[in-house]
A protein has these predicted regions:
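Short helix/turn-capping signatures at newly exposed starts of structured segments
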Residues: 1-406
């Protein structure tokens, strides 16, 4: 595939990708244009998902998107092969196989700026504009062109040539930071959320009592009706009847496999058995939340709070829920609580707070094609926690007067 053309917006984004956008929105843009973004790599550190960026890479187009691992918002766009991506700025094009992004060409297009910085160890000179930087490799024989870390602009070598950019960085400039290669890359951060945004809103969960949404001020107690939930949170993104878990026992563990509603025939009993369940979920994907209603009483009986960590089969189905499960205090004064369980809490820390609960139930997600493998579900009174193999929580279930229930 030839080089594509994307609009360059310094300090804002490139093409359909905007700094600060949640990772779910980036995937939605990708899915809308499968012929353009036909090769997509998702990279993350599976041992410590919160330690390094989540990266969406487009190797055929020479750029990738870096998402903050905690907020899952786009913090940095890096173009690492400028020959594979052509950018449109105003009415001019730069990059791609036909328009070299040389130092002179960049300087002519974007105008004069302050002298950049020279990294002698890397042999790279970086030129900065608000929300935009260009890195240029400097051959060792010309390193003396950058006197005291600076160079005369536009940069040209004694033989009449000018360097071609090796990396372009697009980042939020509101904090006044300069972002480039190496350690300068870590300075990029997602732009501030707009006032009143509910993205990453803290959701306080009091075991056995209610959820409280700290930005909007909504309270959803156990026993609330569907009408109560609609009036507080609005129309759900989806409504689904609860799936039923088929339970087997392997090596002393209970193995839960989620199945769809179906008719099951037994060789010894030709009469069909169904897995119909009257309970149903309200799905709030944009809040990272599911609410389970009792099919008989139509009252809230459970909340499912999703972390949206990569490495789980539900990754990218929900926006991350920034929940805070409050343990050992008096509601609603959250400052009185001795312990809190959040999406960043490790499973070992959960056990320190709530105690050991014994062996886990293994959940297979009902698919042999799931590349992430099974998860482990641990039950306590009024709560259950699902974790992936690396000890991170992938969702938390808050219920009332009950133990683990699939």
């Amino acid at each position: 595939m030839g080089a594509i053309v994307l609009d360059l917006r310094p300090g804002l984004g490139v093409g359909p990708f905007t700094l600060g956008m949640p990772i779910c929105e980036a995937f939605a843009q990708i899915e809308q244009q499968p012929k353009i973004y036909d090769v997509v790599h998702v990279k993350y550190y599976d041992e410590e998902p919160l330690k390094l960026d989540i990266v969406i890479s487009f190797p055929d187009h020479g750029f990738h998107l870096r998402f903050d691992p905690w907020s899952q918002r786009l913090r940095l766009i890096e173009i690492f092969d400028i020959k594979r991506l052509q950018m449109r700025y105003a009415t001019s094009l730069i990059g791609g196989p036909s328009t070299l992004a040389t130092f002179v060409a960049v300087y002519a297009l974007f105008g004069p700026t302050y002298p950049g910085t020279y990294d002698k160890d890397r042999g790279v000179y970086t030129l900065f504009y608000p929300g935009l930087s260009f890195a240029f490799p400097i051959p060792s024989q010309y390193s003396d062109c950058c006197h005291d870390g600076e160079a005369e602009l536009p940069l040209e070598f004694p033989d009449g040539t000018t360097p071609v950019t090796c990396r372009v960085s697009i980042y939020d400039s509101s904090a006044g930071k300069k972002v480039g290669v190496g350690s300068l890359m870590d300075k990029a951060s997602a732009p501030p959320l707009p006032t009143g945004s509910i993205y990453m809103e803290e959701v306080h969960a009091k075991l056995g009592e209610e959820l409280f949404f700290t930005v909007g001020g909504q309270h959803i107690p156990f026993g609330a009706s569907p009408q109560d939930v609609w009036s507080e949170l609005g129309r759900p993104c989806g409504i689904h009847q609860k799936q039923v878990a088929m339970i087997d026992f392997e090596m002393g563990y209970a193995v839960f496999t989620l199945v769809d509603q179906m008719v099951i025939h037994s060789a010894s009993d030709p009469r069909p058995r169904t897995t119909l369940c009257a309970d149903y979920f309200y799905n709030y994907f944009t809040r990272g939340l599911d609410i389970l209603f009792d099919g008989q009483t139509h009252k809230v009986k459970k909340f499912v709070l999703h972390t949206n960590y990569p490495g789980h089969a539900d990754f990218n189905s929900y926006i991350k829920c920034n929940f805070v499960i409050l343990v050992g205090g008096s509601f609603p004064d959250v400052n009185n609580y001795k312990n809190r369980i959040t999406p960043s809490t490790k499973w070992e820390q959960v056990k320190e707070i709530l105690g050991d609960c014994g062996r886990a139930a293994i959940q297979t997600q009902g698919s042999t094609s799931n590349p992430f493998g099974s998860t482990f579900v641990y039950g306590y009174q009024n709560a259950a926690f699902e974790r992936i193999a690396n000890d991170d929580l992938c969702n938390s279930q808050v219920m009332k007067n009950g133990y683990i229930a699939t």
